[in-house]
UniProtKB/Swiss-Prot annotation:
The keyword Chloroplast applies. May play a role in photosystem I and II biogenesis. One of its GO terms (biological process) is photosynthesis. Coiled coil: none annotated. The gene is psbN. It is found in: Plastid, Chloroplast thylakoid membrane. Belongs to the PsbN family. Keywords: Chloroplast, Membrane, Plastid, Thylakoid, Transmembrane, Transmembrane helix. GO terms for cellular component: chloroplast thylakoid membrane. This is Protein PsbN. InterPro entries: PSII_PsbN (IPR003398). The chain crosses the membrane at residues 6-26. It holds the Pfam family PsbN.
Length: 44
């Protein structure tokens, strides 16, 4: 396997895992209590 393609693949996987982990942390972590819920703002 070409060295450049291998490191590019590792970089893309690391980027994908990092973004996914950060999204889960923001959505369910300690800072999630500060997020607003637009469904609770409307009373239909």
């Amino acid at each position: 396997m070409d060295g450049t393609a291998f490191f590019f693949t590792i970089f893309v996987w690391f980027l994908l895992i990092s973004v996914t982990g950060y999204s889960i942390y923001v959505g369910f972590g300690p800072t999630s209590s500060a997020l607003r819920d637009p469904f609770e703002e409307h009373e239909d």
